[in-house]
């Protein structure tokens, strides 16, 4: 091998790095650095190691291998032993920037056969390297002996801890266990025979047990929900009974079977159904009120008898009833004789414009009109007939108008019309034996128009 020549700057950098990392003594470092500089500046190539020269005996190789194990007890295994040893240990700290390969320090041997690298590596230091405690490099040579290890078995015997044991304790080398390894083996050897719960069977058994305990299903003392359901069912069945008008048996138990607080049960007050009206007039009124949404309410209809002013619903009812009654009188002669009817002449040549106006608008002709109208009501006629009650009502209306002729003159036309309408629909007292019937409004207007027309002709 050729001698490697190192520049002085590289040795200075190496010396500075060794001083910082290993804390060597200053004097020893200066002497070693000076010797290294002299060897590096020598133009003659240094002689190679006897071990690597050809023709040397084999005993020198054995001596060199035995000398590799000599180390100081305090410094332990140096990191530079890998560079001087040909066995292949890694070098630490010997190469800083020059990137020396393994065995490069072997070229720095002196000519007298002494290994310069051995003296360089055997320099004592104050602090030791980091004690790994689990590696072969740190634990093989810290046994405190200066004996030379000539065999690999002796070096392995000096190891304090086994690397395989360390790796095994750290978890390496084990097989990956599955999740089933966490389950005890007894669960696999003797599996459970449970198949779950049959909810249908459970509910049936609960119902059967409740029926056996109380046939009437009065279990409110044990199940509070039964009480709530019973009260709710009673409320709905009472409502159904009220609508359908059919009696329904309640579910709520009596006090003798059920000790409950009355305040907990809500008081349900169901009004009795109203009796059906037997009067045809009331039934017709209800039928029209259901069909006509614009008619009055129930309170208004109930107070129609006390109020002299009739509403639109009463007017419709009276008109329909009078028409039906008039048709029956025309078709049944026996009914006509029983009532003692009086004929009314047919209406002919009636002016619609004059018939629509009431007779109140002509105060000067009221006296003559009343007389003519009274004679007209007494005339016999084959086409239209009315009874004595209708004649009395008509005469009462005309008499009421004649009693206040002066007040009618001072009133406005709108007040006269409203008063006339009010008098037309006012109730007339009749005998108890005779059923009261009102004259239709159309017939009254036509009769008044006919009387007025006769007065104008006179």
Curated annotation (Swiss-Prot):
Quaternary structure annotation from Swiss-Prot or TrEMBL: Interacts with PLCG1 and GRB2; the association is increased with prolonged stimulation of the TCR and may facilitate the assembly of the LAT signalosome. Interacts with ITPR1 and ITPR3. Interacts with HSPA9.
Protein name (Swiss-Prot/TrEMBL): Protein TESPA1
GO biological process, one term: TCR signalosome assembly
Pfam families xref list: KRAP_IP3R_bind
Disordered as annotated region, ranges: 328-356, 439-458
PANTHER family: PROTEIN TESPA1, SPERM SPECIFIC ANTIGEN 2-RELATED
Modified residues (Phosphoserine): 312
Species assigned in the record: Mus musculus
PTM field: May be phosphorylated in response to store-operated Ca(+2) entry.
Top-level division of the source organism's lineage: Eukaryota
Sequence ranges of Basic and acidic residues compositional bias: 328-339
Bias (Polar residues) ranges: 346-356, 439-450
InterPro entries named among the record's database cross-references: ITPR-bd, TESPA1-like
MF (Gene Ontology): phospholipase binding; signaling receptor binding
Ribonucleoprotein is among the record's keywords: no
């Amino acid at each position: 091998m050729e001698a490697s020549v190192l520049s002085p700057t590289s040795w200075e950098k190496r010396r500075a790095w060794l001083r910082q990392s290993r804390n060597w003594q200053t004097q020893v470092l200066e002497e070693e650095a000076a010797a290294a500089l002299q060897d590096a500046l020598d133009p003659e190539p240094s002689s190679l190691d006897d071990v690597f020269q050809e023709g040397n005996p084999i005993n020198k190789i054995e001596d060199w291998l035995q000398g590799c194990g000599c180390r100081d007890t305090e410094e332990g295994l140096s990191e530079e032993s890998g560079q001087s040893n040909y066995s292949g240990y890694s070098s630490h700290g010997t190469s800083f920037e020059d990137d020396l390969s393994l065995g490069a320090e072997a070229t720095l041997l002196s000519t007298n056969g002494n290994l310069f690298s051995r003296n360089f590596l055997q320099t004592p230091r104050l602090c030791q390297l980091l004690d790994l405690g689990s590696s072969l490099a740190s634990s093989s040579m810290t046994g405190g002996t200066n004996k030379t290890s000539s065999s690999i078995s002796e070096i392995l015997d000096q190891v304090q801890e086994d690397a395989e044991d360390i790796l095994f304790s750290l978890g390496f080398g084990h097989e990956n266990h599955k999740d089933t390894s966490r389950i005890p083996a007894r669960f696999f050897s003797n599996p459970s025979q449970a198949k779950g719960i049959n909810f249908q069977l459970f509910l049936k058994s609960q119902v059967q047990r409740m029926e056996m305990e109380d046939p009437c299903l009065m279990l409110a003392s044990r199940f509070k929900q039964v009480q709530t359901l019973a009260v709710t069912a009673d409320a709905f069945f009472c409502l159904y009974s009220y609508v359908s008008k059919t009696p329904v048996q309640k579910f709520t138990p009596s006090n003798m079977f059920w000790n409950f607080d009355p305040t907990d049960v809500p008081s349900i007050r169901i009004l009795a159904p109203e009796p059906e009206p037997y009067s045809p007039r009331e039934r017709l009124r209800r039928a029209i009120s259901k069909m006509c949404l614009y008619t009055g309410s129930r309170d208004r209809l109930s107070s129609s008898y006390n109020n002299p002013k009739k509403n639109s619903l009463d007017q419709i009812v009276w008109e329909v009833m009078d028409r039906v009654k008039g048709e029956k009188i025309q078709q049944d002669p026996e009914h006509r004789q029983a009532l003692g009817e009086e004929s009314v002449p047919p209406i002919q040549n009636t002016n619609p414009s004059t018939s629509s106006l009431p007779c109140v608008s002509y105060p000067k002709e009221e006296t003559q009109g009343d007389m003519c109208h009274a004679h007209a009501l007494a005339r016999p006629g084959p086409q239209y007939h009315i009874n004595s009650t209708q004649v009395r009502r008509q005469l009462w209306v005309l008499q009421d108008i004649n009693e206040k002729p002066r007040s009618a003159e001072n009133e406005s036309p709108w007040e006269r019309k409203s008063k006339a309408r009010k008098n037309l629909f006012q109730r007339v007292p009749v005998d108890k034996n005779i059923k009261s019937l009102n004259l239709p409004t159309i017939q009254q207007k036509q009769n008044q128009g006919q009387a007025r027309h006769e007065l104008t002709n006179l």
